[in-house]
Structures are given as C-alpha cells and as structure tokens.
A protein has these predicted regions:
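Exposed aromatic-hydrophobic patches
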Residues: 89-92, 124-132
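Cysteine-rich micro-motifs
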Residues: 54-65
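DNA major-groove recognition helix of helix-turn-helix/homeodomain DNA-binding modules
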Residues: 4-19
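Short, flexible, mixed-charge glycine/proline-rich loop motifs
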Residues: 30-37, 49-53, 130-131
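Cys/His-rich microdomains that often coordinate metals
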Residues: 49-50, 64-65, 144
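Residues immediately within or flanking Cys/His clusters that coordinate Zn2+
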Residues: 40, 57, 137
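Short cysteine-rich clusters marking metal-coordination/redox-active sites
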Residues: 43-46, 60, 140
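Edge beta-strands of extracellular beta-sandwich domains
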Residues: 142-150
C-alpha cells in the first residue's frame, strides 16, 4: 500500500495503522473511564503487563495482544482476601516456581487501579488500601486471569 494512500486513509477514517491493516476498528465504549471496566493485557514473549481504561489496540514485541478474559477461580487458583484495618490483604497457596506462578494481582475500583507484581520463588501476597467495593484480579502464567468481587 502506498504511504500517501495509507496516511490519507488513516486521517480520513481516524483509525490507527494496525486497525487499518487488520480491518477491525477499536471503539472505546468506556468514555467515562470507569476503571472497573479496565482491560488487562499480558505479552506472551516478555511478560509485560499492560492496562487500559477501555478498549484499545495494544501490541508488544511485535504481537497484537488480545484483552485477557477473567474467569472465576477454581480451587487451585483461589486467593484468600482478608479485610484488615482499611486494607485488603490477599494471599494464595498457588505454586510460585519458575515455570508456574502468579504474575500479579490488581485491585480495581471505580476510580483507582493498583497492581502488585509477583515473582517466581517469592510469596503471592499483597496489600491494597480498601476504597469501597471493587474487583480483584490475579494472573497465573499458565492458566490466565481470574477475578473476585469484594
């Protein structure tokens, strides 16, 4: 495709280059930026964790990343949430070895998004200041994203 034509099409259609080439337009329906509607992305190549307040076309290491779909946890991936003096303390008995571990936990309310990164051979524990009701997300490097409302 000619650069002039590409540039003209991008300006006229108001889309990004990846949107133009893929034929899929990304429309952010979360104009109010309610952070409970956040999208999380994880790069399968380098492990980067990316957060967007709404729909976005995200790429890392040359790969276009799909938004993660959060699931209800099974028994092996459940976390314990304790409410201790204005804080949520979360912990998990999930394996934390180099090949299978929890990568992060994120606490999301209407106006705040806080992420704590975990590392292999470390502890899967985090503290978040409690700011009302929200959603807790956590990510297993093998089985994906899980959530629990609080």
């Amino acid at each position: 495709m000619d650069n002039y034509v590409t540039g003209t099409a991008i300006r006229t259609l108001r889309v990004s280059v990846p949107e133009l080439l893929s034929g899929e337009q990304v429309i952010n329906v979360n104009r109010a930026a309610n952070l409970r509607r956040s999208r999380l992305y994880v790069c399968p190549v380098c492990g980067n964790v990316l957060h967007a307040a709404g729909s976005a076309m995200i790429s890392c290491c040359g790969v276009t990343l799909p938004p993660l779909e959060a699931e209800q946890p099974d028994e092996a991936h459940d976390v314990r949430i304790e409410d201790i003096e204005h804080e949520l303390y979360i912990s998990s008995a999930h394996p934390m070895n180099k090949s299978h571990y929890l990568s992060f936990a994120a606490c999301c309310t209407d106006d705040r998004f806080e992420l704590v990164r975990f590392y292999p051979e470390g502890n899967a524990e985090a503290r978040f200041f409690r700011r009302g009701h929200g959603i807790l997300y956590w990510y297993c490097n093998r089985h994906g994203l899980f959530f629990k409302r609080f």
